[in-house]
From Swiss-Prot:
The keyword Metal-binding applies. It comes from Panax ginseng (Korean ginseng). Keywords: Heme, Iron, Membrane, Metal-binding, Monooxygenase, Oxidoreductase, Transmembrane, Transmembrane helix. This is Cytochrome P450 CYP749A22. The chain crosses the membrane at residues 12-32. The lineage of its organism: Eukaryota, Viridiplantae, Streptophyta, Embryophyta, Tracheophyta.
Length: 524
């Protein structure tokens, strides 16, 4: 045996001991880090907040308060509501409703080991939403990332600013005006279908899903509902998966070793969305080439995105993945927001037929039986009041989240870095201290002198489309579409809730009627 071989034999146990020691040190480090994240840090944060007078339910090891939340939600959602009641806050967010009553306007609760500072004090809300640098958007959960990618809703910093400029250009006043004919044509198609249901029951929620899909497909992507149907179906399935996994705590890094059925399904849906949107992009590129105007992709939202993707200036250029992410975002937002808004307006007018008649008279006085026009839409005061009151009672998004970037003063409080802030829109919209004893009643007249007067100039009292620099860029698009649809429906039909309707609001991305919205149509 050579001396070299003897050296190898003698070194092997030493090397083994070294590797074993290194592994033990690494595992000890991982364990300490894990313990710090799931126990020491939460307990420290809980103590910091309690010393400042902020209370809340105690932290539970690893799961935080998620088990309590899931149990409360299961109980609150187990039965339908009285259809005359709009008190949906304790139904949709029973944990927040309960803890606000116990701990006051601002409190701390736990989403797994993550601290969530819930704020409903209006000055705190305003500061959180307006100071985007101090309180940026949170990184989306894994499932939400599959739904929206890194688009305008989830991106931050320079990327968000670049994408926001593009969206502002796509949805400015003149662009919206040019979209009106496509919106009208889509509503006409819907009303043509409704002729088969005259004097009978119809589920208008399903009808509005088709309508809004058609409108966003035509106006933003130059296609049709049928062209985008696969995309809408996949997005709907992703939305259901997201809702199913709300408040489920997952250990960090576990997905590297194990994927749940929902995660596998979400990845398949995400890939399918990417492929479908890529085909729409390729089709637009071919149309541009065939027209002989290479680089001219149209003036709609997709056209502006593709123009930016091919921009000669690298500072303005975006990637193909960026285009896909923005398309997903606008397919979701363009359908969800207006669908639920229209559904709840019809629901409320189906109950309050006096307001239905007031709205109809306003529409007929302005347009008669003529097609609505942009100038007339701006004069729909009663319809606008009804829309605002609907958005107050049934806001599409019932909470917003932000993150504390670094330790900061928040009024008299000191907030540690990385604490999550939750702003429950629904709680503020239903707050009797803001809106009075009739906060849970449908009273559009409260908006008769505008939003500012109704809220006593308090911007943080009513923000169905967000507040501050991150507010929804599609606000005017959604309300314009809703006004056109409502005006044309009121010209043709009166309606009342069907006896088969079950009042069971549920949150699946947005607040919607769980079992559809059945109404009885009567032609005028």
């Amino acid at each position: 045996m050579s001396w070299n071989n003897i050296g190898v034999v003698e070194m092997t146990p030493i090397l083994f001991q070294f590797l074993l020691s290194s592994l033990c040190v690494f595992l000890l480090f991982v364990f300490i880090r894990f313990l710090n994240d799931i126990w020491w840090t939460p307990i420290r944060l809980q103590r910091v907040f309690r010393q400042q007078g902020i209370r809340g339910p105690s932290y539970g090891f690893l799961y935080g308060n998620t088990k309590e939340i899931l149990n409360m939600r299961k109980e609150s959602m187990s039965r339908p509501m009285d259809y005359l009641s709009h008190n949906i806050f304790p139904r949709l967010q029973p944990h927040l409703y309960s803890w606000l009553n116990i701990y006051g306007k601002n409190f701390l609760n736990w989403y797994g080991p993550r601290a969530q500072f819930v704020v409903t004090q209006v000055d705190f809300v305003k500061e959180t939403m307006i100071k985007d640098q101090a309180y940026p958007k949170m990184d989306p959960e894994w499932f939400a990332k599959k739904l929206l990618g890194d688009g305008i809703v989830t991106s931050k910093g320079k990327k968000w600013a670049k994408h926001r400029r593009l969206a502002n250009h796509a949805f400015h006043a003149e662009s919206l005006k040019s979209m009106t004919p496509a919106m009208i044509a889509s509503v006409e198609m819907m009303l043509k279908r409704w002729k088969q249901h005259e004097g009978r029951e119809i589920d208008v929620f399903q009808e509005f899903k088709i309508l809004t899909s058609e409108v966003i497909s035509r106006t933003a992507f130059g296609s049709s509902y049928l062209d985008g149907k696969d995309i809408f179906d996949r997005l709907t399935q992703l939305g259901i998966i997201i809702t199913r996994n709300s408040y489920k705590v997952k250990l960090p890094g576990i997905s590297l070793f194990y994927k749940s059925n929902d995660e596998i399904e979400a990845e398949k849906l995400d890939q399918g969305l990417y492929d479908s949107i890529l085909r729409i992009m390729e089709k637009r590129e071919k149309e541009s080439t065939m027209s002989g105007e290479v680089g001219s992709f149209g003036t709609d939202f997709l056209g502006l995105l593709m123009k930016a993707m091919n921009d000669a200036d690298e500072k303005n250029r975006i990637t193909a993945q960026d285009v896909v992410d923005e398309c997903k975002t606008f397919y979701v937002a363009g359908q969800e927001t207006t669908t639920t808004l229209l559904a709840w307006v019809i629901f409320l007018l189906g109950i309050h037929t006096d307001w239905q008649e007031k709205a109809r008279q306003e529409v007929l006085n302005l347009f008669g039986q003529e097609i609505p026009n942009s100038d007339g839409l701006a004069k729909l005061k009663t319809v606008n009041m009804i829309i605002n009151e609907t958005l107050r009672l049934y806001p599409p998004v019932i909470f917003l989240t932000r993150k504390v970037k670094e330790e900061t003063k928040f009024g008299k409080l000191t907030l540690p870095a990385n604490v999550h802030i939750v702003v429950p829109t629904l709680a503020l919209h239903h707050d009797e201290q803001i809106w009075g004893d009739d906060a849970l009643l449908f009273k559009p007249e409260r908006f008769s002198q505008g939003v500012a007067k109704a809220t006593n100039n308090n911007a943080a009292a009513f923000f169905p489309f967000g507040l501050g620099p991150r507010s929804c860029v599609g606000l005017n698009f959604a309300t314009n579409e809703a006004k056109i649809a409502l005006a044309m429906i009121l010209q043709c039909y009166s309606f009342a809730l069907s006896p088969t309707y079950i009042h069971s609001p549920v949150q699946i991305l947005t607040v919607r009627p769980q079992h559809g919205l059945q109404v009885m149509l009567q032609p005028l």
